[in-house]
């Protein structure tokens, strides 16, 4: 099913985040874009979108292509949920999942697969947005795992 919502033009910022999922787990890697001295584990693919009236599915595919050197999959990002950022007021986040059939289909430096429980039990290790999204991403990861193992 295509997600054809247009990105809102009245928000300060719109961010598209893509969560690679496989075997019921979420792929994360260290990101230091907020604090260089204390990198937090977060989703590896995220972009700020400043365009007005842009299709979020199209933008998510562009973001995935930007990271093609880390991916070995033809899968497309799938819309999951729209929510507001925990850390930046006025920021809307469009969260996508990238379903992978094998954990070998993705490689970022220092990246790894974790469960939503890992994220919940170790809040200081993960970004605030990922902590907010972890339960939903855990359910999405399990759903895609069930789908691929039918």
Model regions: which residues?
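Conserved N-terminal beta-strand and adjoining loop/helix that marks the start
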Residues: 2-28, 49
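Active-site-adjacent beta-strand/loop module that shapes the phosphate/pyrophosphate-binding cleft
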Residues: 12-14, 22, 74-75, 81-112, ...
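Conserved Nudix-box catalytic region and its N-terminal flanking loop in Nudix hydrolases
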Residues: 25-70
